[in-house]
């Protein structure tokens, strides 16, 4: 009898485990979208819609994003578009070009080999994995749609936690246009939040900057990490995200788009143990650099990795290493890794 009870319990646990696994495998697909707050610059060149398979279409906010075009050695600021959403499972995307008929289209990076269909002035395609994309119509790369998709946030910080600096949907201003983050704090920008100021992570430790929000496109040098350690940045859109004199820094799924002079995307100066994972850089100077002594930061660099990322340099270089340093006492840049990069 005892043996029989044990076997019944065993089979019950096994069945529960199998059912539990099936529930995970066939979990419901999810979609998260956010409306742009009133007063933020939008672009009507595209209408962007997304839906779960055979579900209801959701129209996304299409933000105005500026990029730098060089023609005949001169710089011209052009107006492009940007839309953002998160999902799991499979989604259909419809991008309608509101300025005319679509003759040709591209969905970049081309390495993803995403099939699409053109019907009149609409391009449609399906996504099964989060991607950071450029949708281009009729060969125009300077008035394109930047479509940034991610996995849903696993945990959202508690806005009532005193260690959290929380910005919900809407436009937010900060004193002197700068948010200085103390040690031990988490800054959270919710989807639909736009911060009108730089985020400065300077001379601190154990800091996080998270969310699906935006540091406004008018803010130069949107994120600055300096002389700090144990810093984690994820999901934010900003013009730039520089790291100097720091160690143990992770920058994941951050999008950097700039349009002005010296608009480097993700510089690294005299820092160690820096990881860029799943980032997107479209910049008006170098997308990512590794330098020694420069701009007040001193020393070499060690263990810098960029992986699973997309680099688009409208000006200068996608990757730039060296050049700046201490010529009188040369420094070492070592263990630099670039893995699975689209350029």
Which residues are covered by each model-predicted region?
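Bacterial Sec-dependent N-terminal signal peptides
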Residues: 1-28, 210
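Beta-strand-enriched, solvent-exposed domains that form extended recognition/catalytic surfaces
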Residues: 28-159
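N-terminal domain-start segments of secreted/luminal proteins
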Residues: 34, 149-185, 193
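A structural detector for beta-sheet-dominated domains
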Residues: 51-53, 86-88, 96-98, 117, ...
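Extracellular beta-strand-rich solenoid/capping regions of secreted or surface-exposed proteins
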Residues: 123-127, 172-186, 194-210, 216-231, ...
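Short, recurring structural edge motifs at helix starts
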Residues: 172-176, 220, 263-266, 292-296, ...
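Right-handed parallel beta-helix
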Residues: 184-186, 191, 205-216, 229-239, ...
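Conserved mixed alpha/beta catalytic, RNA-binding, or beta-rich assembly cores of soluble enzyme
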Residues: 198, 266-267, 317, 323-325, ...
């Amino acid at each position: 009898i005892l043996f029989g009870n044990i076997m019944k319990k065993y089979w019950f646990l096994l069945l529960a485990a199998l059912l539990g696994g099936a529930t995970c495998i066939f979990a419901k697909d999810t979609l998260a979208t956010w409306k742009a707050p009133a007063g933020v610059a939008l672009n009507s060149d595209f209408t962007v819609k997304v839906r779960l398979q055979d579900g209801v279409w959701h129209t996304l906010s299409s933000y105005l994003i500026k990029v730098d075009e060089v023609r005949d050695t001169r710089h011209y600021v052009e107006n492009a578009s940007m839309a953002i959403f998160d999902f799991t499972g499979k989604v259909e995307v419809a991008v309608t070009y509101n300025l005319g008929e679509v003759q040709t289209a591209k969905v970049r990076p081309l390495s993803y080999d995403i099939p699409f269909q053109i019907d009149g002035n609409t391009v449609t395609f399906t996504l099964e994995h989060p991607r950071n994309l450029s949708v281009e119509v009729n060969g125009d790369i300077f008035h394109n749609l930047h479509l940034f998709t991610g996995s849903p946030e696993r945990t959202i910080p508690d806005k009532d936690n005193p260690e959290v600096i929380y910005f919900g949907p809407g436009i937010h201003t900060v004193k002197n246009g700068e948010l200085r983050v103390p040690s031990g704090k988490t800054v959270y920008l919710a989807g639909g939040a736009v911060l009108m100021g730089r985020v400065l992570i300077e001379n601190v430790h154990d800091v996080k900057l998270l969310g699906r929000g935006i540091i406004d496109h008018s803010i130069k040098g949107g994120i600055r990490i300096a002389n700090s350690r144990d810093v984690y940045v994820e999901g934010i859109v900003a013009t730039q995200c520089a790291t100097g004199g720091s160690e143990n820094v992770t920058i994941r799924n951050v999008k950097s788009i700039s349009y002005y002079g010296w608009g480097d995307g993700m510089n690294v100066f005299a820092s160690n143990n820096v990881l860029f994972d799943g980032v997107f850089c479209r910049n008006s100077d170098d997308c990512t650099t590794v330098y020694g002594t420069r701009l007040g930061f001193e020393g070499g660099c060690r263990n810098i990795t960029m992986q699973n990322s997309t680099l688009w340099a409208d000006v200068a270089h996608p990757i730039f290493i060296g050049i700046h340093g201490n010529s009188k006492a040369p420094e070492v840049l070592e263990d630099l890794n670039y893995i699975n990069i689209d350029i």
